[in-house]
């Protein structure tokens, strides 16, 4: 079974392409800002007519369409590869029950499940791509951020640049910095709406895409487990294990449960509880969960494998194979998580909280690298140096924090194609 680090590496090319398209769009706008700033006001109409012809927006839309096709193809292939790996890990259960373990490609029920999940994950990606926009401050009320399509954002910035070029008595670069900062701070985002409250939610598109892919991977892993469990007659599940688990799932990871017991926290599981399982020795309540050794846990609201949970469940034959981790190993994982790290003049963080902070720092580094690149392409050396200083500062803080926590520095998560350090 592929671990989290291996999956991270597998999905990284898809994420990098998503980051690259963000910088492609920012780069086109930046180059036009530079060109407008360098041309004489009397000749501006020549460049303005070219920009208003829509050629830049057409190029952007073409690249977005190409990206979508490639991303969809790679996402579907990734889901299939993950499924094949997950299926192979279940061979020992088929062998134990003396059931033929047919090749992955010939297991029709499994293929149908994998195809459905791959299609759904791709569909979600397409929906994310359709809902992309910049979040720009309202000129009348700067406190309000409004979603603005890429084409409308382009036109607005070009209009501002033309006006700044034609207005006497102002410094062009200074005038354009406000607009550039907004684009850099926003980046291309996935925008969604709450129809009941009317509120707008947004997050960087590369972050949303990453979450979509991980959701698809979890779904296909669980789908394979559910289907294979039916095929070899599973009577229980084992919850997967990873370092630094979230607090609500930390205690149960690595433990085995009967299907009847597990249905308390996952009633919609496609493996139905086996009524023949004897659970009479367990005290059945709505808020208590028992593993196969009779240990008691509080029932939790967030289901396994949902809402950014990295766990899923293996289908198992209870009493046939021992859990993948001993109690001693599971305790060591929880102890490492709780040991955590205490920053100077700050509250103690669990290792789970440290990893969350690490992800935030990686996103911040990518963001300021975007800024340095856009400022460079716009010909604003002062702004580029300002963002470079931020890159240097945030990278140093990231390395220091990771070292203090004992976490691995993941340079591939801070990489931005095309970025070159100024100093």
Where are these regions (language model features)?
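N-terminal leader/targeting and assembly helices and adjacent pre-domain segments
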Residues: 1-184, 188, 328-423
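Intrinsically disordered, low-complexity coil segments
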Residues: 139-149, 189-202, 263-298, 334-347, ...
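Flexible, gly/proline-biased loop segments at the beginnings
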Residues: 152, 163-237
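Acidic, glycine-rich two-metal-ion catalytic cores of nucleic acid-processing enzymes
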Residues: 203-319, 326-328
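Intrinsically disordered, low-complexity acidic/polar segments
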Residues: 320-321, 374
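Amphipathic, soluble alpha/beta structural segments
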Residues: 321-323, 352
């Amino acid at each position: 079974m592929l671990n989290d680090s291996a999956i991270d590496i597998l999905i990284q090319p898809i994420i990098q392409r998503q980051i690259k398209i963000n910088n492609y769009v920012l780069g086109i706008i930046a180059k036009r800002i530079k060109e407008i700033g360098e041309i004489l006001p009397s000749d501006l109409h020549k460049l303005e007519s070219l920009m208003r012809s829509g050629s830049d927006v057409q190029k952007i839309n073409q690249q977005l369409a190409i990206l979508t096709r490639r991303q969809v193809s790679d996402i579907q292939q990734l889901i299939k590869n993950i499924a094949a790996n997950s299926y192979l890990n279940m061979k020992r259960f088929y062998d134990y029950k003396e059931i033929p373990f047919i090749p992955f490609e010939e297991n029709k029920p499994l293929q149908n499940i994998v195809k459905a999940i791959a299609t759904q994950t791709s569909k979600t990606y397409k929906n994310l791509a359709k809902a992309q926009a910049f979040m720009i401050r309202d000129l009348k009320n700067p406190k309000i951020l409004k979603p603005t399509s890429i084409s409308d954002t382009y036109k607005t910035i070009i209009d501002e640049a033309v006006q700044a070029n034609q207005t006497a008595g102002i410094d062009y670069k200074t005038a354009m910095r406000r607009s550039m900062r907004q684009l850099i701070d926003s980046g291309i985002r996935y925008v969604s709406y709450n129809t009941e409250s009317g509120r707008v939610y947004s997050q960087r598109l590369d972050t949303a895409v990453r979450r979509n892919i991980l959701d698809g991977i979890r779904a296909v892993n669980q789908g394979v487990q559910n289907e294979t469990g039916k095929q070899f007659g599973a009577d229980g599940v084992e919850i997967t294990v990873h370092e630094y688990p979230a607090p609500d799932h930390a205690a149960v990871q690595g433990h085995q449960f009967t299907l009847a017991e597990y249905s308390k926290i996952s009633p919609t599981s496609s493996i139905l509880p086996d009524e023949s399982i004897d659970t009479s020795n367990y005290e059945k309540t709505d808020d208590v969960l028992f593993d196969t050794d009779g240990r008691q846990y509080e029932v939790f609201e967030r289901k396994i494998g949902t809402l950014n949970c990295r766990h899923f469940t293996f289908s198992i034959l209870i009493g046939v194979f021992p859990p993948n981790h001993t109690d001693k190993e599971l305790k060591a994982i929880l102890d490492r998580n709780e040991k955590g790290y205490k920053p100077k003049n700050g509250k103690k963080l669990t290792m789970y909280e440290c990893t969350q902070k690490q992800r935030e720092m990686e996103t911040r580094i990518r963001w300021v690298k975007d800024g340095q690149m856009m400022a460079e392409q716009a010909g604003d050396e002062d702004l580029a140096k300002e963002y470079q200083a931020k890159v240097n500062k945030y990278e140093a803080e990231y390395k220091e924090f990771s070292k203090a926590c004992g976490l691995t520095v993941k340079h591939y998560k801070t990489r931005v194609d095309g970025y070159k350090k100024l100093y």
